[in-house]
Design a protein with these regions (language model features):
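Short amphipathic alpha-helical interface segments
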Residues: 7-22
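Basic, amphipathic "hinge/linker" alpha-helix immediately C-terminal to the N-terminal HTH DNA-binding motif
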Residues: 57-75
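A short, conserved structural fragment
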Residues: 48-58
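Amphipathic alpha-helical dimerization/coiled-coil segments
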Residues: 77-120
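Short alpha-helical segments that sit at the start of domains
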Residues: 1-11, 114
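Short acidic, hydrophobic short linear motifs in intrinsically disordered regions
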Residues: 20-32
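Short amphipathic alpha-helical interaction segments
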Residues: 33-49
Length: 120
C-alpha cells in the first residue's frame, strides 16, 4: 500500500515508538512530530480510515505494520544513499532518510542495499 509522506511519517514514528517500548499517546506522538494535538488527531483518524491503525489506541494493524516495515526498509536504503554515496554524517543521513523514505521505490531500495553489500 502506498502512503503519502505525511502518513509515512506517522506510521514510522508509531512503529519506532512501539518497537522501543514507549507508551504511546496522541499528545506524545504530536510532541515527537512537532505538530499540534488536533493535527495529530486528524492524521490518526485518516490512518484508522485506511485500516493502518486500530480503532482504539495507537496500535498498528497488520496492514499498518506491513506498511511500516516496507517504509523502514526504504528508510534504511535512503540512509545508505545518504551515508555511502553522498557522504553525509550519521545525523544528517538519518534526517534525510526519514524525508526520502516515502519517495524511494522498493526497486530502488533493493538496488541501494545491493550496492552497499557489494562495497562491503
Amino acid at each position: 500500500m502506498e502512503v503519502t509522506p505525511g502518513e509515512a511519517r506517522y506510521l514510522l514514528s508509531i512503529f519506532d515508538l512501539v518497537r522501543d517500548g514507549v507508551k504511546l499517546s496522541q499528545s506524545g506522538l504530536a510532541r515527537r512530530l512537532g505538530v499540534s494535538d488536533p493535527t495529530a488527531l486528524q492524521m490518526i483518524r485518516r490512518l484508522r480510515q485506511l485500516g493502518l491503525v486500530e480503532s482504539a489506541g495507537l496500535n498498528l494493524t497488520s496492514a499498518g505494520t506491513s506498511a511500516a516495515l516496507g517504509l523502514g526498509h526504504r528508510r534504511q536504503a535512503a540512509r545508505v544513499l545518504a551515508l555511502d554515496v553522498l557522504g553525509l554524517d550519521a545525523e544528517q543521513a538519518d534526517t534525510e532518510a526519514r524525508r526520502l523514505a516515502p519517495a524511494v521505490s522498493s526497486a530502488l531500495a533493493q538496488r541501494l542495499m545491493r550496492l552497499r553489500s557489494a562495497r562491503d
